[in-house]
Structures are given as structure tokens and as C-alpha cells.
Amino acid sequence: MQAIILAAGEGVRLRPYTQLIPKPLMTINGIPLLTFHIDKLNSLGITNEKIIVVVSHLKEEIVGFLNRFHRGVRVVMQGEKKGTAAAVSYAKNLIDDNEIVIVYGDTIFEDNLKDFIREENAIGAYEVEDVSRFGKIVVENGYLKEIKEKTETGRGFIFAGLVKTKKEFLEELDKVKQNEKSGEYYLTDAIMSFNQKHPFKIYALKGRWFDIGKEESLIEARRVFNFPDNFFK
């Protein structure tokens, strides 16, 4: 099993913090987000040599950090094409194993993912009070039916930036069309395309989850996470 961590975002909404520090190296109670994800994957039996990190913004800082603290992790530079689908596509040539895990590097969560990685084809979901910031996942009989745009409001499940799937999924990336509004290529479009042939099971994350995209989320995550010694076990 291999893993891809998406760590190429500029962190625009976290400026001025991210002007000098890349978002994946922002710390939660002293632990960089990137370390959190690598340690979590290691605890699942995915070694550093099986982990690929996609970088762009302040890439030299991330590469230096990995060389110092997480030797063996491979790094891929995201090119001109932007967005999460594009990021994964730049890493796909390094995928040899049939099973893959894709992780959005600007999230943090309590679930140990041991049940998640046992699934053949699943996406992580998290229930929130207001889905309007994220876009809503429509669930039918435990499986993904639809991922709606950010026009929905109210309580519901959102995509938590976690995918467990097979290598075949990577073939969908070249089919993703550029979003007219943002100019980016979204992984959720590839998920919905693959879902037509291989339905994704919805895995509801246990415990707390944060998208570290705004200052208030960063502050709240730092308040609630204290990382006990057995956190990654």
C-alpha cells in the first residue's frame, strides 16, 4: 500500500503565517501537520519509502524538513496544472502498489484510520453543523451518491480529504475537466467519475477533524489537540 499526501497549497487564507512557513509545516501543539500525517501512515504499516508528498509553495522548506526528519519519503513537484486532481496526477507515475491512500495535508483528525484502510474503496467523511463552507456529501445506503457544491447549508457530511482506493482510480485523473471558475482540477470530480463504476463506501471519521484552512481553524485545533503518547497507536 502506498500513500500520497497533498502538500502543495499556498495557504492563502492563512497569510501572513504561510508567507514564510508552508502550510504543511504549520504546527499543532508543536507537531507539524506533515509529521502528523507521516506518523499516522507509519502507524498503519506504510513506511516512508511508500509515502509520496506533492509540494509546490515553499517547496525547499518542505524538502529540507523531510530530509531532516522523515528520510525516505519521496517528493514530487506540482507543475503548472493546479488543484487536487492535478496534484495526485503528478505523483501517479510513482505508484506501483494496487492499494493507495490519498490524504489532504491541511487536515488533522483523531481517527486512527485502521478501519478505514481495510476498505477496498472508500472516502473519509465528517459530520458538521454547516456544510456550506465545504460542500455536502449525499449518502445512499452507506455509499457515495453525490458531492454537492458549496450552495448547500445545514448539518451533514462533508468530504474529509481522505481516499482509500486502488491504482485503477488514477486513470480517472486525465478525464477531469478544468473548473471554469477557479481554473483548477478537482479530485472530487475524479471521485465521482470512478464512483459510477466502483462505488465509494462512506467512512465516517471517529473523533474530531479540522480543515486547517483558516486562522480560526488553526487556533481551534491547537486548543483541542494535545496528542497523548498513544495517539498514533
Regions found by a protein language model. Give the residues of each.
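A structural signal for short hydrophobic beta-strand segments in well-ordered beta-sheet cores
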Residues: 25, 137-139, 202
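Active-site metal-binding loops of divalent metal-dependent hydrolases
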Residues: 10, 106-107
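Catalytic-core segments of class I nucleotidyltransferases/pyrophosphorylases
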Residues: 143-211, 215-233
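N-terminal nucleotide-binding beta1-loop-alpha1 segment
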Residues: 1-19, 199
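Conserved N-terminal catalytic core of the sugar/cofactor nucleotidyltransferase
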Residues: 2-5, 13, 27, 31-104, ...
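Short alpha-helix within the catalytic core of nucleotide-sugar-dependent glycosyltransferases
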Residues: 38-39, 59, 89, 110-119, ...
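A short, conserved beta-strand element in the Rossmann-like catalytic core
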Residues: 107-110, 209
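Conserved donor-nucleotide/metal-binding helix-loop-beta segment in metal-dependent transferases, i.e.
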Residues: 111-134
